[in-house]
Amino acid sequence: MSTATTLTVLWVVPVPDFGGVARHVLDVARTGIPGYRLVVCAPEGKLTERLRELNIPVHAVPFGPSRGFRTSFASLTHVIEQEKPAIVHSHLAYADVIAAAAVNSLKMRRLANRSLTVPTLITTEHGIAGDDAVYHGTSWRSKLMEQVHRVRLWGTNAAIAVSRSTAEQMRRKWGARRVSIIYNGVDAPRLRAAVHKHCVPTEPDAPRILSLSRLSPEKGIDVLIEAFAQLHTVYPKAHLEIAGEGDLADTLAQQARELHISDAVTFSGFVDPLEAMGRSDMVVQLSLWENCSYTLLDAKAAGLKTVATNVGGNPEILAPNELVNRRQNAFCDSVLEALMRNCEASAPSAWTWVTNAEMTAQIAELYTQTQKHQGLA
């Protein structure tokens, strides 16, 4: 469709580097939003570099937590005035707050200047947890942010949740209304082919287990190491790859040494996830909370076996026999049972999910319906 007949949507992202949200932005940029011209406002970094490679218009401006409220607000306001988007779509809490402030400031200014155009404001929630400590650490901070989100949602026209669980938490904690569920998409055939390029043949009775996450307490990697140590007594050729970086790297390596499994455990640091999946049979994710995990989506799309905690959006992705209860006393035993079950099982059954094209079509439909509701379409 010609850009002359499309509306501009400005995506606002406060992070410069790769992560779950950057992956989402790139998937949408690569696929396109039907009927809309995508422009991205973000701090300079790897994300903006990749977007330029995709020929996506980018405003790399001083924006994000490190720049502070005043600078971020001024930067975003300038971009909005320059682009005059029909829609401003924010991602992650910092961008949500700044975007709400900027758009609602324009509403106030429009009272004195009716020629000003005020964009529709939409937000996608990627990271709200049932346990407030996961993202906010202290109770006072979580209570403060709860009130901030309640206020900014009053001035937001529509909200997207990446899972049913996410939507439930938004309604329960923030009193959110007009929440639409649009799952993160994954193009399974393309991803499976990409992983297959890195495929390393396995040996009999030599299961290869992969963890792809930050090395931090909420990820439960210590429990995985403990369970793997017991699995290793049954499968002496088993191997565990712990990919990722974080504060617990030394502690987890010491745990592996104390359990006498150092030779069977590799701490590979930051890796290409597709390459890591190519040399693995099973992905394990024991997080305290997940909303719509790209790691699990990719693992399922690649045809790998999976084990994950029964939290957040995980039950919306995985079957019951792939889930373990993190809150029970025998958590490690449950993980071991799931690992053993996967080692003894045949290849996973067929799995289907929302494609990127379906995801972006749903986003476009929400844009159009929200515009109509406001009398703008």
Language-model segment annotations:
Residues W11-T71, I181:
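N-terminal strand-loop element at the rim of the active site
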Residues G19-D27, P207-T233, D247-A253:
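A conserved mid-protein helix/loop that constitutes part of the nucleotide-sugar donor-binding site
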Residues R52-I56, A167-V186:
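Helix-loop-beta element that forms the nucleotide-linked donor phosphate-binding surface
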Residues S90-I98, E125:
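Short His-centered aromatic/hydrophobic patch
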Residues R141-A159:
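Membrane-proximal helix-turn-helix segments that form the acceptor-binding/catalytic region
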Residues L248-T251, I261-V271, A276:
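Active-site donor-binding acidic/aromatic loop of nucleotide-activated sugar
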Residues L288:
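Aromatic "clamp/platform" in nucleotide-sugar-dependent glycosyltransferases that forms part
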Residues P320-A330, E337-N342:
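Conserved acidic donor-binding segment of nucleotide-sugar-dependent glycosyltransferases
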